[in-house]
Amino acid sequence: MRVNRGGLRRSTAALLALAAVATGCSENPLTAPPPTIEPAAPAVAPPPATQPAGELLPLGGRPQAAIFDERSGSLAVLTPGTDPQSPATLTLFAVSGGTRELTLPGPATALAGGGNGSAYLSTRGGYFTVDLTAGTATPVSITDEADTDFTAIARRADGRLVLGSADGTAYTLGSATTVAEKVKIFARVDAIVTEGNDAVVLDRGQTSVTALNSDGRSQQALRAGEGAATMAADPAGRVLVADTRGGQLLVFGVDPLIERQAYPVPQAPYGLAGSRNLAWVSQTAANMVVGYDLTTGIPVEKVRYPTVQQPNSLAFDDKSDTLYVVSATGAGVQVIRNAAGAR
């Protein structure tokens, strides 16, 4: 068994720092807000020193997230409005060619897919459902949550949605509009992924991951490096976490939640995408993306490609072995075909 002693020392230091904050905040830590650290962020990428690999599609603005939907054969990219109250935009790139731009009914904070031809975007008071084939968006209000600032969203295998909020609550819906269970144990919910009907919540302020069972109740919670920033699930049931501050790729199993692998990835790892063959990680300080084979028990680098500037968002099409790299500075969408190649 491999022991990542450097990562262990860093995680212990982060944990001790959080414990010190907790001691100073309140004499009753059970009722105090969760202790937090400054959330990790991607590096400010320099201009690319090398021509990006593959093809480049134009896309301006400051895109925030991307998914690939196999049923509709399209890449969906979320770009926030120019201010927090402005409507967001969802840009759809079809594999068959052509681009459509859909202005959403309001601001959107996070994007999720389900492989069912739809996209789901969190917003204040609820979420939007987008039919990716028709290019139509439907707002959905969640009962009694009109003033809730939802910040994260994911779809379970049974079709139920899990959302998170800025005040640190995770909501498991019982129907399209009603809450079946909610737990308020986080500083903030920054990302959610699902594996079957279980969910995993990322809290950047606590640099932690927490499992929710099919009833929406919290299960195991683990520290995630020195500054976990992003999270993705892969087809093998693994949860990938980029420890941007600690310079690591963390790999978790879900049931139960357990850290299975920790591997050093320098240059501010941030963007993530899971695929059948490789785990993809972008290095924002270097404008690079790396594909790792996780099947040996320790990540093994198989391929790497130069990217567009600020490669914060990744998405992958397993059917065509195509990697999409989205620039967060308006440098476009990079399309790398046969990305995994002959391994």
Predicted segments with their positions:
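Predominantly soluble domains enriched in secretory-pathway, periplasmic, or organellar proteins
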Residues: 2-10, 19-343
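Long, low-complexity, charge-rich intrinsically disordered regions
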Residues: 13-14
